[in-house]
Structure formats: structure tokens, C-alpha cells
Amino acid sequence: MRHSVLSISFAVALFLECYTPSTAIPIGKMDDVALEQDTLDSLLRVEVSENSPDSVRGRSSKIVLLADSGLWMNLNRGLPFYKLRAAAAGPDRALTLDRQEAGQDLSPSISIVRRDTMRCMVGRVYRPCWEV
């Protein structure tokens, strides 16, 4: 679930913020594009130098969030979620579960008939087969 939420949020961020339509430019117009780019760069430098730090704070900023799946383990004291949940239940509960499993061997609720098995080749694979 964590991976799907992360991948969905990453996809939404890519589609909403980073979507820029691209167009092919003929080779003859490359000189014009370079001239326009130089003009744009010079205008942006002038605009940045004229703006004070106070006016920059008023603008909206983009926040990029990068997450690592190993980070969740570090946040939960190095334990995955299911182990953290078992640890929160307490050590007594974990021990009683082991005792219950050991007690089930003495009185099984489902009878299991064990037979001597032999290996028979079926096709290219050895499968268990029983003597009659």
C-alpha cells in the first residue's frame, strides 16, 4: 500500500507540475532561438538583481519530496510495520502464541495420515507417489 501511494503521488506531481509540451524546431531557426535565449537570460538576470529578498519570499515555492522505503524502517526503530505491531502487543503475547502452536501438535484438530512416500518421475519432475 505504501508503494502504491508513493507512486501515485509521484505520478500526480509529474503530470501537474512538470508537464511541458515539447515541439520540434527546424534547423534554420536554431540561430533565432539562441538569440532569443540570450535575450531571455539577460532579462532574467536584471529581474533577479532588481528584486529584494523580501519580494522573493512572497512568491509561491515548489516543494520536492523524495522518500526512501528504508526511511520507514528507521522511523519505526528499525522494525517493519508488522514486527512493530507484534512488539507493541508485548512479549507475553508472543510467547503464548508459541505455546499454543506447540500445544496443537499434541491434539491436532485435523487428522493427517502420513504415508511412506516414494519419488516417481512424472515427465521430467520427481513427484511423490505412494505404494499400494
From Swiss-Prot:
Tissue localization of expression: Pituitary gland. Produced in neurons of lateral basal hypothalamus which project both to the brain and to the neural lobe of the pituitary gland from where MCH is released.
UniProt-recorded Gene Ontology molecular function terms: melanin-concentrating hormone activity; type 1 melanin-concentrating hormone receptor binding
Gene Ontology CC entries for this record: synapse
One of the protein's GO biological processes: chemical synaptic transmission
Record's keyword annotation contains Ligase: no
Its biological purpose: Plays a role in skin pigmentation by antagonizing the action of melanotropin alpha. Induces melanin concentration within the melanophores. May participate in the control of the hypothalamo-pituitary adrenal gland axis by inhibiting the release of ACTH.
UniProt protein name: Pro-MCH 1
Annotated source species: Oncorhynchus tshawytscha (Chinook salmon)
Lineage: Eukaryota, Metazoa, Chordata, Craniata, Vertebrata
Encoding gene, per UniProt annotation: mch1
